[in-house]
Amino acid sequence: VCTVGGEGSHHALATALHARAVGLEAHLLLTPQPHTAHSRATHAAALAAATSVTALAASDPRSFAVGLAAWRERRRGYLIPTGGSCALGAVGMAEGALELRAQVDAGLLPPPRALYIAAGSGSSLAGLLLGLAAAWPDPRARPEVIAARVTPRHLVSRGRVLRIHEELKALLWGEEAPPPHVAAPPPFELLSATGPGYGAPSAAGEEARGWAEGVGFKLDPSYMGKMMGLLWARERERAREEGRAVVAWGTGAE
């Protein structure tokens, strides 16, 4: 198998470890990133576990194409998309949205008016959108979705998210028409929160991480910290004034 990610990618490390456990070779194409102690340790573990590691010049689609072509010339195998991003992987996020609705119905939390999520490669967001549409058939009752893009634009875009959403519908319903309320994805915002770049802590994210740690939550700087920074900037005063419930959807941790 071959997959792609940043040097500190949990997905790349997990691919290498699990491939080795079942007797498969694991070939990683890794892009450079600024490092924290955690990402540096993750990178070292991936180097030790993988069959081969190709260092890409930068997080650039041209560099990726060259690295992938070189791998295909040498070997035959299965390519796992960047971050494992695919329709099958999005199923769990759709189910997560149904769990959220069940918790609301059980009175465990108030109906959320907004939901924030970090977007790295798009499949988590696509699955969440489909799940929210299924869980809240009335679009007026659905939480608005704000995605914080934490990777370069070519890795996650509205078009990519919508494409995975279509693939997920095809996976779940096949040739049958899905229910009308899930036929089209709910509206969503995809806003940049990359800051200095992928893996590099942002000022807003670090401020939000400090606040979160004070109330008992440890957020990673690459995904959750930047997402929380966006939430903090947009919702801090609004939530106080309107008393509205907001969900921060967790997708990464150290």
How does the language model describe each region?
Residues 1-254:
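PLP-dependent amino-acid enzyme catalytic core
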